[in-house]
Amino acid sequence: DVQTGLNMIICPELAVYSITHDRDKVLRDLADMAMSRSKNEFTRTTVLEGTLLPWRDTKVPESLQKVVDWCVEQGAYQAFNDVTVGHFGFKPETDVLYSSRRKQNFNLPECRDLVRVEFSKDSQKAFGAKPSAGARSQYMVLSKFAQYDCIVHFHCPMKPGANVAVRPQRMFECGSHQCGENTAAGMMEYG
């Protein structure tokens, strides 16, 4: 900010890092993040013709609908330039995930329709639209924890006193294989 001298890094997944008036520090942090993230691996998504799965379709688990709807009601998905940060989906079979779509405002019901994504080791094919950047990470987490079939992710401040593990994320871009591995490694039971 040229008026206040405040600097910050806003990364592609809209997380904010290094909020400071020390320009040299924020530039060092930015260079460090860029070097770390440049080593991340990604699987390119091929988008093919197809039809989206409507949010209220009976194939969409009722539990996923209820949780996402509740999160929306609680303000979990904050819009910035009419796009919300986060993603959600479900895994109905071994190599298939239905994921939320990229660059949507999940506060609008029509933006919650899901895209079918088929995975193999070296490719992922989406049908009808581009899936969330986090689709590969969703798939990796649900593959590691096969007892679960749904996943919901959003950015929000921690509740004071919350006993929830936090994984460092700044070196992993959302959608990278390393992001999925980092997230899966930090998963644990609560409650």
Name each region found by the language model.
Residues 1-191:
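Glycine-rich flexible loops
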